Swiss-Prot record:
Component of a multi-subunit COQ enzyme complex, composed of at least COQ3, COQ4, COQ5, COQ6, COQ7 and COQ9. Interacts with COQ3. The lineage of its organism: Eukaryota, Fungi, Dikarya, Ascomycota, Saccharomycotina. This is Ubiquinone biosynthesis protein COQ4, mitochondrial. One of its GO terms (cellular component) is extrinsic component of mitochondrial inner membrane. Keywords: Lyase, Membrane, Metal-binding, Mitochondrion, Mitochondrion inner membrane, Transit peptide, Ubiquinone biosynthesis, Zinc. HAMAP family: Coq4.
Amino acid sequence: MLRLSLLRSTATLPVKCQRRGLILPAAAMYTLGSLIFGKEARLADAMERGELHNKNVDYAKEAEERTELRIRALANTRPMEPRYNGHVPLHRYEKLLLFAISGWNSFFHPEDGYNIVQLGEATALPVFLENLKQTMLSDSSGRRILKEQPNITTEILHMDKLAKLPHNTLGYVYYQWLKRENVSPDTRAPVKFIDDPMHAYIFKRYRQCHDFYHAITNMPIIIEGEITIKALEGANLGVPMAILGGILAPLRLKKVQRKRLYNIYLPWAVRTGLSCKPLINVYWEEMLEKDVTALRKELKITLPPDLRTMRKERAALRKEIDAKYNSQKRATTPA
């Protein structure tokens, strides 16, 4: 019996050792996991209670200081310190790149206003802006505009009041034009890449007055209308981007659109721009209650043929021709 018990104990010894060999690593893994995940859980709880960080340190202030240091480091790579709110100084090679990229994008994607905005500033050379400044300084209204530096916004213009003005006033015509075209004076992009603060304001003023040029000439914001107004601005103010737009933009239009522009609207725009008073000197905000016909006469602006009407008549004529063609085709086709 004793020998049998010894044999059984000897036989079960490897099995126990084997089990112990499995249990010990498992216990070690469990202990290690408890330490790791338990520590993470405690850290999470401490973070939630606000006990993790040093309470004597203002981490929000430190983050703000780090951001400020990064901004200063970036500013040190600029050719000059920003000279007005929103100013982004560019090196000469960056201005050339801005001109090349925005010019390319504007030609192939004229519907994207951001491209036009960048091209406008890239081509707004100091000599042009200084000439525009002298034009404003030579006129009493222009001098007041430079001194007061007004902004054209919906808040300043009081759109609700414009809607109630007599229908023959500039303010009502302007309000109706904005409503019909579904645009707002608040959507004009700020100037960023022009270095001189006064030049930057002059270009911003030109940009903000653009919709008044549309409204007083009853020109829609479709591509033909935009090219026409750009040609008007180029002839009247000498805006480089407007001159480029008047020359190059028609090349991408359909034949019938180019024909309308070359035969009617571009000649009108150049003739009117050269003969009318400098539009940059018009204090539009003070003209809102004035009779629009009298104002056109004062500025020497004549209305062009209504572009919307011409397009509708062209579409109706084409529809009529297509209907006649299809009718004749059905009549001559054997059943």
